[in-house]
Amino acid sequence: MSWALKTTDMFLDSSRCTHRTYGDVCAEIHKREREDREAARTAVTDPELPLLCPPDVRSDPASRNPTQQTRGCARSNERQDRVLAP
Protein backbone atom coordinates (compact mmCIF):
# COMPACT_ATOMS: atom_id res chain seq x y z
CA MET A 1 0.00 0.00 0.00
CA SER A 2 1.38 3.39 -0.90
CA TRP A 3 2.19 5.97 1.72
CA ALA A 4 -0.68 8.21 0.56
CA LEU A 5 -3.26 5.44 0.84
CA LYS A 6 -1.91 4.33 4.20
CA THR A 7 -2.04 7.90 5.49
CA THR A 8 -5.57 8.41 4.19
CA ASP A 9 -6.77 5.14 5.73
CA MET A 10 -5.24 5.99 9.09
CA PHE A 11 -6.71 9.49 8.95
CA LEU A 12 -10.20 8.19 8.20
CA ASP A 13 -9.97 5.52 10.90
CA SER A 14 -8.70 7.92 13.53
CA SER A 15 -11.10 10.74 12.65
CA ARG A 16 -14.05 8.54 13.54
CA CYS A 17 -12.83 8.17 17.13
CA THR A 18 -10.90 11.34 17.92
CA HIS A 19 -10.51 14.90 16.76
CA ARG A 20 -7.11 14.46 15.15
CA THR A 21 -6.14 16.40 12.07
CA TYR A 22 -4.58 15.06 8.92
CA GLY A 23 -1.28 16.60 10.03
CA ASP A 24 -1.47 14.77 13.37
CA VAL A 25 -1.90 11.46 11.58
CA CYS A 26 0.99 12.24 9.19
CA ALA A 27 3.22 13.14 12.13
CA GLU A 28 2.33 9.87 13.86
CA ILE A 29 3.13 7.86 10.73
CA HIS A 30 6.49 9.62 10.33
CA LYS A 31 7.29 9.05 14.00
CA ARG A 32 6.57 5.31 13.69
CA GLU A 33 8.63 5.06 10.49
CA ARG A 34 11.58 6.77 12.22
CA GLU A 35 11.27 4.39 15.18
CA ASP A 36 11.18 1.39 12.82
CA ARG A 37 14.27 2.60 10.96
CA GLU A 38 16.12 3.21 14.22
CA ALA A 39 15.15 -0.22 15.55
CA ALA A 40 16.37 -1.86 12.34
CA ARG A 41 19.63 0.11 12.44
CA THR A 42 20.20 -0.85 16.08
CA ALA A 43 19.44 -4.51 15.43
CA VAL A 44 22.07 -4.66 12.69
CA THR A 45 24.82 -2.96 14.71
CA ASP A 46 24.02 -4.33 18.19
CA PRO A 47 26.86 -6.67 19.31
CA GLU A 48 24.57 -8.22 21.92
CA LEU A 49 22.51 -10.03 19.28
CA PRO A 50 24.22 -13.37 18.53
CA LEU A 51 21.44 -14.51 16.20
CA LEU A 52 22.70 -12.16 13.51
CA CYS A 53 25.88 -14.26 13.24
CA PRO A 54 26.01 -17.37 11.04
CA PRO A 55 25.17 -20.59 12.94
CA ASP A 56 28.71 -21.98 12.57
CA VAL A 57 30.08 -19.17 14.75
CA ARG A 58 28.41 -20.72 17.78
CA SER A 59 29.73 -24.21 17.00
CA ASP A 60 33.07 -25.72 17.98
CA PRO A 61 35.78 -24.19 15.74
CA ALA A 62 37.74 -27.46 15.60
CA SER A 63 34.79 -29.29 14.05
CA ARG A 64 34.30 -26.70 11.31
CA ASN A 65 35.70 -26.94 7.82
CA PRO A 66 38.71 -24.57 7.91
CA THR A 67 38.20 -23.56 4.27
CA GLN A 68 34.61 -22.49 4.91
CA GLN A 69 33.96 -18.82 4.26
CA THR A 70 32.16 -17.05 7.10
CA ARG A 71 30.62 -13.61 6.97
CA GLY A 72 29.10 -11.24 9.45
CA CYS A 73 31.11 -11.63 12.65
CA ALA A 74 34.69 -10.72 13.44
CA ARG A 75 34.80 -13.41 16.10
CA SER A 76 34.25 -16.14 13.50
CA ASN A 77 37.25 -14.87 11.50
CA GLU A 78 39.40 -14.82 14.63
CA ARG A 79 38.39 -18.37 15.46
CA GLN A 80 39.07 -19.47 11.92
CA ASP A 81 42.57 -17.91 12.09
CA ARG A 82 43.30 -19.87 15.26
CA VAL A 83 42.20 -23.11 13.59
CA LEU A 84 44.36 -22.44 10.51
CA ALA A 85 47.43 -21.29 12.42
CA PRO A 86 50.20 -23.96 12.31
From Swiss-Prot:
Residues 76-86 have a biased composition (Basic and acidic residues). The keyword Acetylation does not apply. Residues 62-71 have a biased composition (Polar residues). It is found in: Host cytoplasm; Host nucleus. The record marks Y22 as: Binding to TAP1 subunit. The keyword DNA-binding does not apply. Residues 2-35 are annotated as: Active domain. GO terms for cellular component: host cell cytoplasm; host cell nucleus. GO terms for biological process: symbiont-mediated suppression of host antigen processing and presentation. Residues 33-86 are annotated as: Disordered. Keywords: Early protein, Host cytoplasm, Host nucleus, Host-virus interaction, Inhibition of host adaptive immune response by virus, Inhibition of host TAP by virus, Viral immunoevasion. Plays a role in the inhibition of host immune response. Binds specifically to transporters associated with antigen processing (TAP), thereby blocking peptide-binding and translocation by TAP as well as subsequent loading of peptides onto MHC class I molecules. Empty MHC I molecules are retained in the endoplasmic reticulum and ultimately directed to proteasomal degradation. In consequence, infected cells are masked for immune recognition by cytotoxic T-lymphocytes. The N-terminal active domain blocks peptide binding to and peptide transport by TAP. Interacts with host TAP1 and TAP2; these interactions inhibit the loading of peptides onto MHC class I molecules. Belongs to the herpesviridae US12 family. This is ICP47 protein. The gene is US12.
